[in-house]
Amino acid sequence: SGGQGDDEDVTEASAMYRYMKSRGVPDYQLLLEESSRSTYENMVYSKMLITERERIRRATLRAAMAESGYLLPPDEEIVIRVGILTSNFHELRAKGIARQVGISNVSGISATSDPVLFVHFCVRECFAILKDKFVGNM
């Protein structure tokens, strides 16, 4: 997920979607959220997309299985696993915000950051964590 900055030709989501497809990740495992402008919005909008896709998938599956005489377990017994692909310095905050908005089974998948800029990113991220904790996003 991720919107488009003023100096960017494509949304972050679109760029990552194309990258994941080029690496062989199938369409059914990807969702495209291009509206967010912050990590908090990323998680809120992504949760909405995941919830809607899962509702449609389960309704379709429930109907098909009912025709065969099978039942699905109740929705509350289904656990949806979500992976957050982000920078190594950003993983802690992204997972914390995801949990706060109700994405409980979340795993971080972190990419290594530029070692020259890593300290700068970590300092900036510390302030972002403090801000998100203060406003209740984490």
Q: Residue spans of the language-model regions?
A:
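A structural signal for short, hydrophobic/glycine-enriched beta-strand patches
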Residues: 1-124
